[in-house]
Amino acid sequence: MIRKNPYTEEKYKHYKVTAPAPLLEWLLANLNESKSKVKATLQNRGIKGECKCVTQFDYPLNVGDKISVSKSKKNDLFRSRYVKIVYEDRFLVVIEKNIGILSMAAGHSSLNVKTVLDDYFRKTKQKCTAHVVHRLDRDTSGLMIYAKDIQTEQLLEHDWHNIVYDRRYVAVVSGEMEHDEGTIANWLKDNKSYVTYSSPVDNGGKYAVTHFHVLDRTVAHSLVEYQLETGRKNQIRVHSADMGHPVCGDIKYGNGDDPLHRLCLHAYVLCFHHPVTHQRMEFETPIPAVFRHLFK
């Protein structure tokens, strides 16, 4: 008796093309799914064109072509209130982390993303473990990459700044920002109490550059997009405080302004060249609804 593995079994919904278009454009017009989810289905080899898997975004479709879209996904067996799998292949996994969970084990806390993913890999009979290549603070939410083998981990770590070409965060900061956009650059260094502080001149720390763009504002708060040119510890939180508009809910660098009872920082865009296939990988999550609600 052959037992079907729910991890690999796929079922498809079938469509017929009625007007010529590039594949991604056609999928976005005909599937009631977000752009990130459609791209993930493509990259997960969940789309078939004329009975063969297609991953090319600009694959040309002609009138009469048959398109099959997978209805089941590898992460159907995955359930976690803290972690959402956005994309997965044999080399890596992209997840969206909730607040309240560490990126990896630290101290006596057993709740961390690596442990959650390792448990998922065991349940789905994958012979791999999650390898940490970058981190988000416990109370920062958003997109992260985990490698599934040591070789992919090393490729990502050794060439991180060339592989990852766009990382953007969104934050609710205290007060009304004076400028619509700009750049802040200085040196960041930890003191003996592990508090990161900045200096306009070289203080022996690491040079940090953050670009910002205001998306919305009220007298009380501003919704700000941050794009990292460097990725230093606590960079956005320190730079926000330097501008006089700390991230809301920031106990360490904030001013007590805590309208949502959480650190209002979310990693919402992550774009990189796949370390093995070299394909451009672009992921974007919605700005948290609770952030948007403050500006209605």
Please provide the spans of the model-predicted regions.
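RNA pseudouridine synthases
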Residues: 1-296
